[in-house]
């Protein structure tokens, strides 16, 4: 086998280094289990009832923490479906034509039947030069993964993965259960921390573990509470981290609340319709990740929606099994709770995204 070049060696080294934060969290979690379950509950606690209650509650939180963390790490980010990729002939035309009207016409023809409503800051179709595809709404190119990610929120080094449509719910639950895990440890460890601090308990091997465990749990509780609170706010507004920093641009212009459907509908966009799955790291988000219902406050173009009959979710996001195309819907200027989304055969058909498109240019977003 031919030796790999310097570029291949660097890529492999980077891939190894990217796992360091995950290994750190895993080692810290393993030590916290030993410190709490063994040194605190079994060695230091004298009351049997207290031991049983603390161990049962701790193992429940520990299991949910590990489950959600695992799902966040190993759920593959979803990429745009084939319909957003340019055909071989279209790619050849783009390579032959200069960056002029002929070049733009190729993109115009490719995008006219796609359910896309967001644009670049200049009003052009969002196109990725590296992936050679037209970006779906809320899709962005990750420079670390070097691919376009559906509804990308951010690339998280602590999970060594892109957080997007396929695993955003898992990421939220990971934050929630890790926060509860740290708060529970800090609360139940506090009295023993004070007793060791005031020399109320003899110096033993457990002293270091119990005291350091409290400091670590309290420190992580503070940082996790702010991060979890921020993402709860994002969910309530139906925004991603990228959209919070840069408002999405639609055909009519910038609209910071363009995807907000109201608190209840925003929650269901992420957690799904069946509340029994909300607290479990099981995929239940609405939609297919390629098109999203919008609430346009400045203009009233036709928008894709998810009617009741098509409200099925992609049960296996890793396999890219998307539900049927959403029907089009003419929405009012403000989407209210009194609106009902019903399937109407007279309204069905493809949304013609290219009817009022401005001149198209290329976008290279990393």
UniProtKB/Swiss-Prot annotation:
Cytoplasmic side: 1-15, 69-169, 229-366
Segments for region (Mediates localization to plasma membrane and recycling endosomes): 298-366
GO function terms (MF aspect): palmitoyltransferase activity; protein homodimerization activity; protein-cysteine S-myristoyltransferase activity; protein-cysteine S-palmitoyltransferase activity; protein-cysteine S-stearoyltransferase activity
Region (Disordered): 297-366
InterPro entries registered for this protein in UniProt: Palmitoyltrfase_DHHC (IPR001594), PFA4/ZDH16/20/ERF2-like (IPR039859)
Motif NPxY-like endocytic signal per record, residues: 357-360
Keywords: Acyltransferase, Cell membrane, Endoplasmic reticulum, Endosome, Golgi apparatus, Lipoprotein, Membrane, Palmitate, Synapse, Transferase, Transmembrane, Transmembrane helix
Motif (Non-canonical dileucine endocytic signal) on chain: 334-335
An example Gene Ontology CC term for this record: recycling endosome membrane
UniProt-annotated catalytic positions: 156 (s-palmitoyl cysteine intermediate)
Protein EC: 2.3.1.225, 2.3.1.-
Main enzyme class: transferase
Predominant location category: other
Parts of the chain that traverse the membrane: 16-36, 48-68, 170-190, 208-228
Keyword Hydrolase: no
PTM comment: Autopalmitoylated.
The DHHC domain, residue ranges: 126-176
Lumenal side: 37-47, 191-207
Assembly with partners or alone: Monomer. Homodimer. The monomeric form has a higher catalytic activity.
Record family assignment: Belongs to the DHHC palmitoyltransferase family.
Function recorded in the entry: Palmitoyltransferase that catalyzes the addition of palmitate onto various protein substrates and is involved in a variety of cellular processes. Has no stringent fatty acid selectivity and in addition to palmitate can also transfer onto target proteins myristate from tetradecanoyl-CoA and stearate from octadecanoyl-CoA.
Protein name: Palmitoyltransferase ZDHHC2
């Amino acid at each position: 086998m031919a030796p790999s070049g310097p570029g291949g060696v660097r890529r492999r080294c980077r891939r190894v280094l990217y796992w360091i934060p995950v290994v750190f969290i895993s080692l810290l979690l393993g030590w916290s289990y030993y410190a709490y379950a063994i040194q605190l509950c079994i060695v230091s606690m004298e009351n049997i009832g207290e031991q049983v209650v603390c161990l049962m509650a701790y193992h429940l939180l520990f299991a949910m923490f590990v489950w959600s963390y695992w799902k966040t790490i190993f759920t593959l980010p979803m990429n745009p479906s084939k319909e957003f990729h340019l055909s071989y002939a279209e790619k050849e035309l783009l390579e032959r034509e200069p960056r002029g009207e002929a070049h733009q016409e190729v993109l115009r023809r490719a995008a006219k039947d796609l359910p896309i409503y967001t644009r670049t800051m200049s009003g052009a179709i969002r196109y990725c030069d590296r992936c050679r595809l037209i970006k779906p709404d809320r899709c962005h190119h990750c420079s670390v993964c070097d691919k376009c990610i559906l509804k990308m929120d951010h690339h998280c080094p602590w999970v060594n993965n892109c957080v997007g449509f396929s695993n955003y719910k898992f990421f939220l639950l990971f934050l929630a259960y890790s926060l509860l895990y740290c708060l529970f440890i800090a609360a139940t460890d506090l009295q023993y921390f004070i007793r060791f601090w005031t020399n109320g308990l003899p110096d033993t091997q457990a002293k270091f573990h119990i005291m350091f465990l409290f400091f670590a749990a309290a420190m992580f509780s503070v940082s996790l509470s702010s991060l979890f609170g921020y993402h709860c706010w994002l969910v309530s507004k139906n925004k991603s981290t990228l959209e919070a920093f840069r408002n999405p641009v639609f055909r009519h212009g910038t609209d910071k609340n363009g995807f907000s459907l109201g608190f209840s509908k925003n929650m269901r966009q992420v957690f799904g319709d069946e509340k029994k799955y909300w607290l479990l790291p099981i995929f239940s988000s609405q939609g297919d990740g390629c098109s999203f219902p919008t609430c346009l406050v400045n203009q009233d173009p036709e928008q894709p929606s998810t009617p009741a009959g098509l409200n099925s979710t992609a049960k296996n996001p890793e396999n890219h099994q998307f539900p049927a195309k959403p029907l089009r819907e003419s929405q009012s200027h403000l989407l209210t709770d009194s609106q009902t989304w019903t399937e109407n055969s007279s309204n069905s058909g493809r949304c013609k995204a290219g009817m009022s498109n401005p001149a198209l240019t290329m976008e290279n977003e990393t």
